[in-house]
A protein has these predicted regions:
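Catalytic cores of secreted/periplasmic lytic hydrolases that degrade extracellular macromolecules
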Residues: 2-59, 63-180
Length: 180
């Protein structure tokens, strides 16, 4: 994949000088608002077919960060998506004895950017990109179908079910649209 559009989007945000790189939250609504702001701002600098749907970003952020941003990874590492550390990236260890190294981000927005870049660049998410492109061409957004492409995101065999359940909950609460 050509990473130039993603790099250009990141540089554009960095140079804009008007973006709030960090946000404080004390409740679920503030957490959701911060994630939305970052996702919308970053996506606005990407070509349409490189954007990760806001609904999907919210579903994964809320699932991975304990539904309200209060997971240890979110609070101590600004990591809202359970993104693993690679090579020499700063990390914290998972407390579940798995030895998983979870990446630490300096700023909260960096987690949203890394999540978007991960889905756009990693070979693990080629199915996601293909489905997103198909939906883009057909002018549709089906979060359920996109979720089904993310089985490699976590080792949990019930991960897809849990994401779909989170999407259902967020739809019921009026936080995300139907996605179809």
């Amino acid at each position: 994949m050509n990473t130039l559009p993603v790099l250009c989007a990141t540089l554009s945000l960095l140079c804009s000088g008007v973006f709030n790189w960090d946000f404080e939250y004390t409740n679920r609504q503030e957490f959701i608002g911060g994630i939305k702001d970052y996702a919308v701002a970053y996506n606005s600098h990407l070509q349409d077919f490189h954007r990760v749907p806001l609904e999907l970003t919210l579903v994964q952020a809320l699932h991975e960060s304990g539904a309200d941003g209060n997971s240890r990874f979110a609070k101590e590492g600004n990591n809202f998506f359970g993104i693993k550390a690679l090579n020499d990236e700063e990390y914290m260890l998972s407390l579940d004895n798995s030895g998983a190294k979870v990446r630490i981000f300096t700023r909260k927005c960096d987690s949203v950017i890394a999540y978007t870049d991960l889905l756009n660049e990693s070979y693990h998410y080629e199915d996601f990109r293909n489905e997103r492109l198909r939906q883009y061409i057909e002018d549709e957004v089906d979060i359920e179908k996109l979720i089904e492409t993310l089985s490699v995101y976590a080792e949990d065999k019930k991960y897809i079910f849990k994401l779909k359940d989170m999407a259902y909950t967020l739809r019921k609460e009026g936080i995300i649209e139907n996605g179809k």
